[in-house]
């Protein structure tokens, strides 16, 4: 066999399988089947509705069967294609069943969104190891199982697909009171970066995106397992709508993106933590204790969504802060030149603060 040495390894791979490109080309949403975990409330619920409005076929997964039925009925009444799968993402067999149901119904899926998550509020030494392990089942192992199912499907078909993991600003920077949540998100961020590099090295047809939300107005705090006397809440802080996260997720479903930050707050904290770690420690020690709870008594721990499904079909929480209607930073990141200018501005601001 004659080898054309003028052709690179990447080009040879592309010739063998035209679907594999150095820059993957993802389908338009109107031509996609999208799997969304944690779809019964908050970010997942808003993303499912928005994806359906853009023409995607939706596979909604969560533990709350009643909410899933209500959601899919709502979408079908509007003329959209949607199915639901009751699943606990902390169980690998349930995650595999989500993939199998999507494939048996629609023949494939094109985007997989690992969104399901829950939090525990309390001082690190107060939270039981049992509760910590349960949170990792949902927040870390769930995305791992989802990643494996998605990558297996995309590589098996040889057609590009998107894997989108929803992280957190606390996956870039630890915080007080939510130590276990931050640890699970740190693990998810490390997993996402590692699997991305391996897949890129293998020229696998998978776009891997990590979403970094700031504080979002969802029932996240109402679902939390709380050891605090006062109710967890986004309090006295900048709060973004779940639509801003959904827009970022769906943008990444069509356009390969490495990272997307929701809110300049999320990006600024990540940068400050990397550039000035001790200063950031001090700032967060001073601010975060008081900005993560409201003044009312905490909900009973048994009402949390850590072990059982939380209330469904609610996209907003009961947070009190500076509500933003959108994230201008997220919109800017869709345009690389504008994004670079914003980042440069943040760096200059951080440097100026240091010099004072």
Swiss-Prot record:
InterPro entries the UniProt entry points to: NAD(P)-bd_dom_sf, Sc_DH/Rdtase_CS, SDR_fam
Annotated signal peptide: none
GO MF: oxidoreductase activity
Enzyme class, broadest EC rank: oxidoreductase
A Pfam family: adh_short
EC assignment: 1.-.-.-
PANTHER family: DEHYDROGENASE/REDUCTASE SDR FAMILY MEMBER 7B, DEHYDROGENASE_REDUCTASE SDR FAMILY MEMBER 7B
Name listed for the protein in its UniProt record: Uncharacterized oxidoreductase YxnA
Gene for this chain: yxnA
